[in-house]
Amino acid sequence: MRLLTTIIATAMLTTLTVSTAGGQEANYSREGADTCLSCHEEDSTLALFKGAHANPTDPRGPFGHGQLQCEACHGPGGDHAARVRRGQERPEITIRFGAGATASVEQQNGACLGCHEADAGFGWHGNDHDMNEIACADCHTSHTASDPVLMTSTQPEVCFDCHQQQRTQMLKPYAHPIRQGKMDCSGCHSTHGATSEWQFAQQTLNQTCFDCHAEKRGPYLWEHAPVAEDCGNCHDPHGSNYPGMLSMRGPMLCQSCHSQEGHPSVPADADGLPGVAASPYMLGQNCLNCHTQSHGSNHPSGSRLMR
């Protein structure tokens, strides 16, 4: 009987001990989350049980059957939870996330990627956030019922913590309905799987825009080259002082490519000839007053994009 007890105890200790990358042994606590909750009873910790990470019915989650619970993310906590003698300091938890993090960004993200890297469309390594050493916990909040960065109404504020210029642009008179809570940043950007320069949700800017603005996609009988090339040639997607989120006022925007030379920009006289010198900005009017189909036209006589 004593031999059997010894064998069982040895097996238990073996399951509670793993080897770290450095060859050292790290001890897991014997009672999982119960050990942690004996001290960590604050609301910010208990909120974990309202979210997806603590769902006991999800076999993929940290609290699924046979999983390591808190230690699946925070690493082995046996030493941290052990009784501390008077005068000694309690060892730090293996991986602490977010503010006051003691682990490197690589260690923090490694804990998350251990599960989430298998998600469809997920490609963290090499994208802009990874290259700038952004930790998952800088954007995500796990100990909560609803992660703010996953909610349309709250996601922009999380992004704006770093992207201050975009916050300012969104305050301009003409912008996507971000502030109204009708769309979020991830409608256009993919922070995890994008490989494009600006981390677009699709491979290019135009493909991303056309997801919503399908009527501008074409193909058209009469194309407007800047539209086919890059929507950003004419539009400021984060906000503008001009209708249609144009990057400049109509005449100046158009004349950044089109010269006014040879264009009747003043009222003609009785002979159909200009009466005075042409105004460089067409009397302050807007090219779009006449060239209404600026994205392209399928009209047989629409080569000038006027119908």
Model-derived features: positions:
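Bacterial N-terminal signal peptides
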Residues: 6-17
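Short sequence/structural segments immediately N-terminal
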Residues: 20-307
